[in-house]
């Protein structure tokens, strides 16, 4: 089971000089993806228990379009193991004009993570 969301990083997301977006924003996106996956599987938002690994691989800037994708790779009694990847798919081109942007021929992986979510048994309403 997979989920994908795509959104534009705004100037509000920029946290550091040079319009750099805080890496924690990618984790927030992964949390949203995980919530959708849990709703699809269990009919409940569940809880994010822990990240097992997080790797930041490339910078993200205001104006970048990011795809965040997640997949449930293992289903336990109440735990759900997930893998996540965030990719930059569109970048602004301020060198051309204030409103120019390019769709990347090859997306740039900006973050990868693995984690575990939990849906308590008494809240699971998914298909059995």
Swiss-Prot record:
It comes from the Bacteria. Its EC number is 4.3.1.14. It catalyses: (3S)-3-aminobutanoyl-CoA = (2E)-butenoyl-CoA + NH4(+). This is 3-aminobutyryl-CoA ammonia lyase. It is an enzyme of class 4 (lyase). Belongs to the KAL family. Pathway: Amino-acid degradation; L-lysine degradation via acetate pathway. The gene is kal. The keyword ATP-binding does not apply. Residues 1-123 form the HotDog ACOT-type domain. Homohexamer.
